[in-house]
UniProtKB/Swiss-Prot annotation:
Any one GO CC term of the record: male germ cell nucleus
Source organism superkingdom: Eukaryota
Tissue-level expression: Expressed in testis and thymus. Expressed in the B-cell lines WI-L2-NS and Namalwa (at protein level).
GO biological process entries: double-strand break repair; double-strand break repair via homologous recombination; fertilization; male meiosis I; meiotic cell cycle; meiotic sister chromatid cohesion; oocyte maturation; reciprocal meiotic recombination
Recorded name of the encoding gene: REC8
Function: Required during meiosis for separation of sister chromatids and homologous chromosomes. Proteolytic cleavage of REC8 on chromosome arms by separin during anaphase I allows for homologous chromosome separation in meiosis I and cleavage of REC8 on centromeres during anaphase II allows for sister chromatid separation in meiosis II.
Post-translational modification: Phosphorylated.
SUPFAM superfamilies: Winged helix' DNA-binding domain (SSF46785)
Protein name: Meiotic recombination protein REC8 homolog
UniProt keyword annotation of Nucleus present: yes
Family stated for the protein in its record: Belongs to the rad21 family.
Amino acid sequence: MFYYPNVLQRHTGCFATIWLAATRGSRLVKREYLRVNVVKTCEEILNYVLVRVQPPQPGLPRPRFSLYLSAQLQIGVIRVYSQQCQYLVEDIQHILERLHRAQLQIRIDMETELPSLLLPNHLAMMETLEDAPDPFFGMMSVDPRLPSPFDIPQIRHLLEAAIPERVEEIPPEVPTEPREPERIPVTVLPPEAITILEAEPIRMLEIEGERELPEVSRRELDLLIAEEEEAILLEIPRLPPPAPAEVEGIGEALGPEELRLTGWEPGALLMEVTPPEELRLPAPPSPERRPPVPPPPRRRRRRRLLFWDKETQISPEKFQEQLQTRAHCWECPMVQPPERTIRGPAELFRTPTLSGWLPPELLGLWTHCAQPPPKALRRELPEEAAAEEERRKIEVPSEIEVPREALEPSVPLMVSLEISLEAAEEEKSRISLIPPEERWAWPEVEAPEAPALPVVPELPEVPMEMPLVLPPELELLSLEAVHRAVALELQANREPDFSSLVSPLSPRRMAARVFYLLLVLSAQQILHVKQEKPYGRLLIQPGPRFH
């Protein structure tokens, strides 16, 4: 199983909440559930399963999930989505309840239209109508006469006064037309307004996949009733019926006369009434026939949660240990600056380009030619020693050749510098093959005496233009020297290239050193190196920071 810190780390990983919801590693709050974007998470899981995610660093393999991890993440997505749906249903129910409560508010203030329907306030009318304190002034044929507001009736006097008998007057019969049915007064409300309506129940949202319980069949009801009857029978034990042998023994003991049934006599009184067999109480059971006492019911164990995996989540200690070992990670390559990456000439000339750029045929020819056999080198050692002695003889000029070479320089100075550098390299290679004991005695014993050079007469200096030459010593080759040489070429209105800095006959170490310095200057944007075609002319141009 693969663990990725950037995927499963809590609060930082993209699948941390999904992983915790699937494994039940810790309790999640509502905010963490609602923070998950289910659609985007499903797309990311699908990209990881189908190996579409790019590696975190170039050169590393693409991350892929195991079957266990992908299954756990799918279960976690289902649980998170289910919890989000549950939160949505709860929020909707809460909103509906609050709306229902807002509709059930009872108004206790009187409406503005109701006071006009009531009887007029006489005291208020007296205060408003100062000119007519008696509101009933000028009104005639008022029956019954309303009391005056100035006379306060005595209730006790009214209660004690005798009520006069009223003679009923029979009005004459007058033919009347059939009247229309009386209309219901406005004060009577319709039954719909009086009837108390039940609150409409809140409908629950149907959840997909939820099934109702099946109806109980007749057979299942019979089985349940039979189980209840069996439980009742176990609680009240019945006596077994007497054996036929016991019944015969009882009959013989009583005799034939007692067994004979007596008829009913009217004069005889029934002193005792024996209950029938069905109503007789059962005799207490004997200790031999007592049923065994059932053992006390065993206490049910608490239901435990089922875990399919013994270890649902890796422990923090083991997780940290795996991170420290870095067994599943690649080490980050140490990138050195161009000033420190010094390659030897053998590596530079044996690897012309990347291996993927050249076809295999050309690459094989190049590697074959770039690696000379060691035997050929050993054979050339004595030949090179003889050539070196000849070069030393040639290098010692005579008194006549010195002014001639000074006036007519036929051989460029770079050739002589290259010859001296190659001689120095061969001297170093020969000295390195000698053991240290002999090397210490080498300058004392075999050091030849320096030959006496002839005195050269002084000649007047002839102003002449010297060719562009870099210092022959590798230690003196620096960025400033290469920069100065390129600047001189540009001042002379010439197009500098690599061959103008290093001649074709110069040693490989010098060419590699100058090429390395050019790369450093191009990285610093001081120079701009361009090559139009492979193995072609290497042009040098001033960069943005050239000054």
